[in-house]
Each structure stands twice: as structure tokens, then as C-alpha cells.
Amino acid sequence: MADDLGDEWWENQPAGAASSPGASGGEGGGDTEMTQQETAPGPALSKKVKPPKECFLIQPKETNEDATKTRKRKKKKITDILAKSEPKPGTPEDLQKLMKDYYSSSRSVIELEELTLPDSCFLKANDLTHSLSSYLKEVCPKWVKLRKSHSEKKSVLMLIICGSAIRAVELIRSMTAFKGDSKVMKLFAKHIKVQEQVKLLEKRVVHLGVGTPGRIKELIKQGGLHLNPLKFLIFDWNWRDQKLRRMMDIPEIRKEVFELLEMGVLNLCKTESLKLGLF
């Protein structure tokens, strides 16, 4: 027995005995803990935190094409639409509709019906092929006879209503072939006082008056111009200014025109002693 124990007995143990958990008891768990401690990372070393650097982004320059794409679409103006569309001549129905639209919020249905004018009071409208002289010759073929028989002061036989003093001067120049020996008077406010025009109407016989509705209204109010002898009232309806606006497209002018019509013009039209024309 003693000799057997002296041998290196551990060399004769099976290979799995040393590594088995039962043989080693608590030693195996200690080895595992050692391994975990060795492999576990240690606390991170404190490093100096560098302040963040500012970063500047250089934006690419905007080209003309990009600007065109990002530009907002412009709203179409009435002048742009009218510039591309063909002009349409005014009609008596246009005047009737404008009048009813203007008074629709302030008049009753019965009062609006009273504003309606008979078709017989309208002259043939300009179809955009006439000059002023040719149009007046067509709608007033007996003008020379009327002119010769007119002798009443503070009145005219024909009124031509337009939107501005400059336009009134242009119309007077363009009617030379029609007026002949007729006496023409400018009826607008530019450089001419109302009192001066009243005196001129009192002194001499005038056949034709060309002017703005505002000044004509004022002359009627002050008694300088009587409407009873009036035979023709012509609106410069189709002409457009630099902004492509017609006379009746301008709110101030439209208001004055309708106020003028109510100062006795509508009543004269209904009795058919006065004719309306749209040039």
C-alpha cells in the first residue's frame, strides 16, 4: 500500500475528473469569476472634450432658371386678358345691365323696372368700324336741318360724354367732317371754371357739347344747361385708355353717368324725344 501511494497517483486519474464540477467543488466558480473580471472593461479614461467647431455651409448660387421656377405665379390682370381678347362693341343691353347692377342694392324691384328704357330710344350702336364723324352721319342724317333750326341758348342739340378732358379734345378734332358750321363747346373741368362755361352758354348758341359727366352734371345743377332741347346723347363707350379700361369700367365715371341719367335724361328717353347712342 505504501508503495502504491508513493506513485504519482494523479497522473492515473481519468481526463474528465479534474474538470468536473463535482471534483473541484467551489474552485470552478472561482475560475469563472476571475475570467469575467479579467475580460470586463475598466472605467473609461476621462478625455478632454473639444468644443464643437462652427460649420459654415456654402449655398450654391441661384441661377436664373431656379429663380424662375421658385417665383410665384402672377395673377392674371384684366388688362392682360383684354390685351389678348378681341374687343366687342357695346350694346344697349350692356347699358341696361350696368344700370340695374348699380342700383340693385339700393332700389326695389319696381324701381329697377322703372329704370328700363325702351329699345326705341337707342340709336344703332357702333360696330367698331366707324370713325366718330361717320358714325354721327349715320345715326343723325338730318343734322344740318336740326342745326339750322336750333336757336335756344343755355342748351345743346347733342351731348357727347367721355371719360376725360384729353379724350374730349381728341373727339372734337375727329368730328370735323361731321360738325361743319356747328358750334362746339368743351364741357370739362380742366382749366375751365363752371361759371365761365355758364356765361358762355348764356351768351351764344351751341349745337354740340363734348365733355365729362361730372362737369355736365354741375352745369345742369347750376341752371347753365337745359336738357329739354337735347336730341342726342352719345356715349364714348368702346374707347379704351392705356390700361384698356372703357369709360364705364371706371367706378367714378360710371357713378356720375348714372346720376346724370337720373337728372331728366331717362324721362326724356321714355318720351322718345331723346335718343341714346353708344359709339
From Swiss-Prot:
InterPro entries: Cms1, P-loop_NTPase. Pfam families: CMS1. Signal peptide: none annotated. Residues 1-94 are annotated as: Disordered. Residues 1-10 have a biased composition (Acidic residues). PANTHER family: PROTEIN CMSS1 (PTHR24030:SF0). This is Uncharacterized protein C3orf26 homolog.
